[in-house]
């Protein structure tokens, strides 16, 4: 019987989206638990040393924190057993691997500003959803008054973090322009391939899905924006959260990646 892992986090977490997508695509059994779970506060946080998510717990009590480390845990475990993951995250060829790493970095760092901007600067549309969502994850069984205080504290921290990351009145026009350009370019690419590098997701896709799912396709304001102006990207987000192969948009079955000498022009723009 396969091991069932415990994954602690929250749906709104950018890096939780990266890990969840990977586990689903690999058909790795797991139970998703919220950061407000008493066990997380009593056992996980002291062991890790701080309040941070996601954290994966194995059946023997081993804890792995950080999305990249969790993915590497499974990839390295398979390699040590002379096995291969169902859908290896790291391409075997040089150019494809370099492109995958580049987009992993872009997803985790380059997309951070639009993710934070479109979450925290549109309260009229987002705030009610965010408050309910954060409270459900961080304080699921407490009284409403205390839960709202928890949200207010978390919200203030995240808004300050957004500014620290470079989301300011001066930078917002450029952030919005660059994000719109990304949606346009990625939409064009997704008309010819279901994933970044071809027929299956790689570490580049897991980097992209982190901001695209948790913030930009899930929070009300940017979700509507994506559905209206970049439906191909929205369907990509849905594919990345499905454990099975999804043959929408005229794609045929197959999990091959582009060869190094046949990278599409849409990856070079």
Question: What feature does the model see in each segment?
Answer:
Residues 1-145, 196, 216, 269:
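GST-like domain detector, emphasizing the conserved glutathione-binding G-site
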Residues 113-269:
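GST-like fold's C-terminal all-alpha helical module
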């Amino acid at each position: 019987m396969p091991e069932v892992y415990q994954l602690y986090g929250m749906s709104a977490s950018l890096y939780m989206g990266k890990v969840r997508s990977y586990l689903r695509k690999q058909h790795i059994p797991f139970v998703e638990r919220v950061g407000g779970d008493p066990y997380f506060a009593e056992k996980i946080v002291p062991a890790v040393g701080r309040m941070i998510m996601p954290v994966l717990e194995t059946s023997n009590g081993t804890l792995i924190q950080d999305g990249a480390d969790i993915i590497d845990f499974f990839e390295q475990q398979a390699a040590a057993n002379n096995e291969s993951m169902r859908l290896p995250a790291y391409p075997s060829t040089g150019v494809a691997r370099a492109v995958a790493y580049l987009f992993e970095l872009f997803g985790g760092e380059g997309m951070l500003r639009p993710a934070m901007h479109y979450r925290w600067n549109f309260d009229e549309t987002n705030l009610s959803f965010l408050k309910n969502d954060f409270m459900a994850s961080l304080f699921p069984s407490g009284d409403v008054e205390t839960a709202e205080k928890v949200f207010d504290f978390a919200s203030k921290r995240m808004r300050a973090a957004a500014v620290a990351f470079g989301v300011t009145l001066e930078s917002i026009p450029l952030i919005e322009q660059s994000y719109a350009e990304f949606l346009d370019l990625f939409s064009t690419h997704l008309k010819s391939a279901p994933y970044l590098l071809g027929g299956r997701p790689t570490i580049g896709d897991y980097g992209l899905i982190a901001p695209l799912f948790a913030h930009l396709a899930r929070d009300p304001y940017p979700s509507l924006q994506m559905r209206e102006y970049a439906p191909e990207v929205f369907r990509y987000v849905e594919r990345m959260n499905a454990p099975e192969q999804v043959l929408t948009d005229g794609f045929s079955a197959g999990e091959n990646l582009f060869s190094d000498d046949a990278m599409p022009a849409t990856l070079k723009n």
